[in-house]
């Protein structure tokens, strides 16, 4: 039974490889939005706060501050609605979850930029 579930989940995975990003990186996620009969692409840019799960159910939580208000948005990485993911800047953090950024604004919400080669996973 468990093998059948795993096979079904593997069919749902993206065929093309996802961009390599980690917690602390600033990424831009382009999603497909359907408004009435029209289809358009909407882009959300934010800092990766958490990356959860694995397989078809893997999610990423992004955080950004716009007009003084903090926003959070979660995305299913293997969703067919995601058009693309682009890494804007690499971040240097010492935590796996950056939930402490929620209450911060301005410079306190900044993540140090990582400069140098990224070691493979």
UniProtKB/Swiss-Prot annotation:
It comes from the Bacteria. One of its GO terms (cellular component) is cytosolic large ribosomal subunit. Pfam families: Ribosomal_L19. PROSITE patterns: RIBOSOMAL_L19. Gene3D superfamilies: 2.30.30.790. Keywords: Ribonucleoprotein, Ribosomal protein. GO terms for biological process: translation. Disulfide bonds: none annotated. One of its GO terms (molecular function) is structural constituent of ribosome. InterPro entries: Ribosomal_bL19, Ribosomal_bL19_CS, Ribosomal_bL19_sf, Translation_prot_SH3-like_sf. NCBIfam families: rplS_bact (TIGR01024). Belongs to the bacterial ribosomal protein bL19 family. PANTHER family: LARGE RIBOSOMAL SUBUNIT PROTEIN BL19M, RIBOSOMAL PROTEIN L19. This protein is located at the 30S-50S ribosomal subunit interface and may play a role in the structure and function of the aminoacyl-tRNA binding site. This is Large ribosomal subunit protein bL19. The lineage of its organism: Bacteria, Pseudomonadati, Chlamydiota, Chlamydiia, Chlamydiales.
